Amino acid sequence: AKEKRYKELQQFEFNPVYFGYNEFTVDSSYTDYLKRVCRILKSHSDLRIKIIGNTDGDGSEAFNLELSKKRSNEIKLILIKNGIRTDRMIEEYNGELHPIDSNDTDEGKRKNRRVDFSFI
């Protein structure tokens, strides 16, 4: 069982959930992916998940921190609707502090408007 678990977790790849400008609504194109995350959490009852909200650099730091919180919370609500208990989730709100690309281009900003995940 340990080997099966290890293999399943090794094969699973987290992808960011991206958001529109000033948006915190999760696009329906992510539904299947988020259900897959929930299936893995359900099949490994000791796993927990960290949900990490991020924004681009537009707007004030305070505004972006709040927006990253809203993005993280939207994901949390989806996981709850799919049967994941809140005590298995940790939320982190980075605002604009951890960009993965430049905030000087539209493409870079798009990549920074995201929620990342990790198992813990």
What kind of region is each of these model predictions?
Residues T25, S29-T31, I52-I120:
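Periplasmic OmpA-like peptidoglycan-binding domain that tethers envelope proteins to the cell wall
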